[in-house]
């Protein structure tokens, strides 16, 4: 049986987790991203080529490494698709090696609007958010009302849940 290695950060910032994971990836069969969003990035330099990743685990740049995005990650579909496209343009077979949990909560435009509006309304107590909707998406996840990746495969359910969410959040944006 293989062993599992877990890299945890406790500083909520640029601690070098990505670099450590990248160092360990040569010996890994899989790399799993279990939480977070596209607000942070990690830069990898492999064979002199620089790549910046925000959502996709760094193992994607290593042959034969499966990459998994777990349900604790909040996913901005537009950011994910941009990252996939950039990697595929470099010849990385992303679609063959990336698996995404259908339970991942989606970051939608209203999450971004809420995040930015809240930060703008704070006079002195700004928290320094990236304004990418991460916090509001996690609020929906914890409250069990968020749209998830799996909802994209059921258009009727997606439409009903989206309508409910827009009604819930629109009052805060008016």
Curated annotation (Swiss-Prot):
Protein role: Plays an important role in the de novo pathway of purine nucleotide biosynthesis. Catalyzes the first committed step in the biosynthesis of AMP from IMP.
Active-site residue numbers: 14, 42
Note describing how the cofactor binds: Binds 1 Mg(2+) ion per subunit.
GO biological process, one term: IMP metabolic process
Secreted found in the keyword field: no
Subunit structure, interactors included: Homodimer.
Source organism per UniProt: Stutzerimonas stutzeri
MF terms in GO: adenylosuccinate synthase activity; GTP binding; metal ion binding
Listed Pfam families: Adenylsucc_synt (PF00709)
Main location: cytoplasm
Enzyme Commission number(s): 6.3.4.4
Keywords for this protein: Cytoplasm, GTP-binding, Ligase, Magnesium, Metal-binding, Nucleotide-binding, Purine biosynthesis
Binding site for Mg(2+): 14, 41
Amino-acid positions noted as binding IMP in the UniProt annotation, renumbered to this chain: 14-17, 39-42, 130, 144
GO cellular component: cytoplasm
Family the entry assigns: Belongs to the adenylosuccinate synthetase family.
Cellular localisation: Cytoplasm
PROSITE patterns: ADENYLOSUCCIN_SYN_1, ADENYLOSUCCIN_SYN_2
Protein's UniProt name: Adenylosuccinate synthetase
Organism classification: Bacteria, Pseudomonadati, Pseudomonadota, Gammaproteobacteria, Pseudomonadales
Catalysed reactions listed for this entry: IMP + L-aspartate + GTP = N(6)-(1,2-dicarboxyethyl)-AMP + GDP + phosphate + 2 H(+)
Pathway: Purine metabolism; AMP biosynthesis via de novo pathway; AMP from IMP: step 1/2
Named cofactor requirement(s): Mg(2+)
Binding annotation for GTP: 13-19, 41-43
InterPro entries membership: Adenylosuccin_syn_GTP-bd, Adenylosuccin_syn_Lys_AS, Adenylosuccinate_synth_dom1, Adenylosuccinate_synth_dom2, Adenylosuccinate_synthetase, P-loop_NTPase
